[in-house]
Amino acid sequence: MKTSFSLDKDQAVRDLVRGGYAKIAEETSAGCCSPGVSCCGSAPQDADKLARELGYTKEELQALPEGANMGLSCGNPAALAALQPGEVVLDLGSGGGFDVFIAGRKVGGSGRAIGVDMTAEMLAKARRNVAFYREQTKLENVEFRLGEIEHLPVADNFVDAIISNCVINLSPDKPQVWREMARVLKP
């Protein structure tokens, strides 16, 4: 059972992370909780170079809306998830939409890619990018929702796959994140 002290501490962590990412969204610069630092170390000067090193293809990067790649990645979850056409994929901590837009192309018109982020500024950035994505792909299969990964705004047994890129580690209540993931995944 969590005490009021631990709940206050959890909220303080969320507020710190939310504030750091809000600043990044507003500055459109790379970094994690302070400019120039990602959750995996120093942020690169070239976000596309980092993405290529993580296995994103040149074609994937060129197809992204401007500003979606902020150099915050620590991996390539859409590739590792082996997403299939028709699947519903959920991205925890979707930020500017980088992995959601890539996942949306992989699941195609019969699938859906949903991004959840707790930072209104990141969601605004992602939502501004949706028009470009739809124009390029002719797909209407991506959406972004405001919420915390410990309390997902997603129905039970709704998604086929969950991806996340350097975000779960920032949660002060990881067991709750895993419970939420189990709740929203289809059996």
Predicted regions and their residues:
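Conserved alpha-helix/loop element of class I SAM-dependent methyltransferases that forms part
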Residues: 42-88, 98-106
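A short acidic, Gly/Pro-enriched loop at the edge of an enzyme's catalytic core
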Residues: 85, 150-162
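Conserved class I S-adenosyl-L-methionine
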Residues: 86-95, 114
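Conserved SAM/SAH-binding beta-strand->alpha-helix loop
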Residues: 119
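Conserved SAM-binding loop
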Residues: 126-127
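Conserved SAM-binding strand-loop segment of SAM-dependent methyltransferases
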Residues: 135-150
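A short SAM/SAH-binding and catalytic strip from SAM-dependent methyltransferases
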Residues: 160-173
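A short glycine-rich, Lys/Arg-flanked "PGG" loop and its adjoining helix->strand segment in the class I
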Residues: 175-187
